[in-house]
């Protein structure tokens, strides 16, 4: 395809254009379950901005290589930072665009063009935050979803909490986020999170591309304006503002405390965390 400007370089990510007007973004850290390290967030944000600005593109598909869509943040990186006495968590070494772009450049993105999440496997933490920000979710039957942050002493502070509450209601959102449970694709479909499930043996990316092709066949102007109208109902209270209020307030206290460091360290060491009483 010919573009007005070439796409930006993004590490550990494959960019392809398998059919007209469609961008496919594949997170490619399969050994790390496509966990996203800090330097990758602004790079992905730049890619989504390029996608919005490129006139020839009408729909994007996000997926992961291997057995995971995205397992969230790179907690090994966090643990290494903590061991070196450096800030860990979302605020450490954060790009200024984090509040408006979020995890993977997507979880707080408003943008103007649609993104379909092709969830091929594990979709946890920040991966779940990205999926919830997508316009539609096509999932493999074996995919698993969850926000397990509370089990490791961190918080889903990239936009998922207000969005999840709007999609599934406070009680179900509380069940997922406060208990840290994971859920099968079929249950997520029954909750209204997942649009379509691809049966075992099928290709979730191929199915997402069929959806993307159908969308790309519509008027690009109508799609952009219709999506803007949908977001007007979706974000009556801006999740970006909600995220910033938490992020710039109580979350800083959490980052400075012992429990986040212990949670990340215990995860890397594959042991149960030993929590301290909260001082928040």
UniProtKB/Swiss-Prot annotation:
The keyword Lyase applies. InterPro entries: ClpP/crotonase-like_dom_sf (IPR029045), Enoyl-CoA_hyd/isom_CS (IPR018376), Enoyl-CoA_hydra/iso (IPR001753), Enoyl-CoA_hydra_C (IPR014748). A motif (PTS1-type peroxisomal targeting signal) lies at residues 278-280. Belongs to the enoyl-CoA hydratase/isomerase family. The lineage of its organism: Eukaryota, Fungi, Dikarya, Ascomycota, Pezizomycotina. One of its GO terms (cellular component) is peroxisome. Mevalonyl-coenzyme A hydratase; part of the gene cluster that mediates the biosynthesis of at least 11 siderophores, including beauverichelin A, dimerumic acid (DA), Na-dimethyl coprogen (NADC), eleutherazine B, ferricrocin (FC), fusarinine A, fusarinine C (FsC), metachelin A, mevalonolactone, rhodotorulic acid (RA) and tenellin. This cocktail of siderophores for iron metabolism is essential for virulence, and more specifically for the fungal virulence in penetrating through the host cuticle. Siderophore synthesis is also involved in conidial germination under iron-deficient conditions. This is Mevalonyl-coenzyme A hydratase SIDH. GO terms for biological process: fatty acid beta-oxidation. Its EC number is 4.2.1.-. The keyword Chaperone does not apply. Keywords: Isomerase, Lyase, Peroxisome, Virulence. It is found in: Peroxisome.
């Amino acid at each position: 395809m010919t573009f007005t400007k070439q796409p930006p370089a993004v590490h550990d990510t494959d960019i392809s254009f398998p059919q007209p007007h469609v961008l496919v973004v594949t997170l490619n850290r399969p050994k790390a379950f496509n966990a996203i390290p800090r330097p990758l967030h602004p790079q992905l944000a730049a890619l989504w901005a390029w996608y919005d600005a490129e006139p020839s593109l009408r729909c994007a598909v996000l997926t992961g290589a291997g057995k995971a869509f995205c397992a969230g943040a790179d907690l090994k990186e966090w643990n290494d930072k903590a061991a070196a006495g450096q800030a860990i968590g979302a605020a450490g070494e954060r790009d200024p665009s984090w509040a408006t772009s979020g995890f993977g450049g997507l979880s707080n993105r408003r943008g103007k063009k649609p993104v379909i999440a092709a969830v091929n496997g594990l979709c946890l933490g920040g991966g779940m935050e990205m999926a919830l920000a997508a316009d539609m979710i096509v999932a493999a039957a074996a995919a698993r979803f969850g926000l397990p942050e509370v089990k490791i002493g961190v918080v889903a502070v990239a936009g998922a909490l207000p969005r999840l509450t709007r999609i599934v209601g406070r009680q179900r959102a509380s069940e997922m986020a406060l208990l840290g449970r994971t859920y099968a694709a079929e249950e997520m479909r029954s909750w209204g999170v997942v649009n379509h499930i691809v049966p075992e043996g099928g290709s979730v990316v191929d199915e997402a591309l069929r959806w993307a092709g159908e969308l790309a066949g519509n008027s690009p102007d109508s799609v952009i304006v219709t999506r803007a109208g949908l977001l007007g109902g979706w974000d009556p209270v801006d999740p970006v503002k909600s995220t910033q209020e938490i992020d710039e307030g109580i979350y800083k206290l959490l980052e400075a405390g012992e429990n986040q460091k212990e949670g990340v360290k215990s995860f890397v060491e594959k042991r149960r965390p030993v929590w301290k009483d909260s001082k928040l």
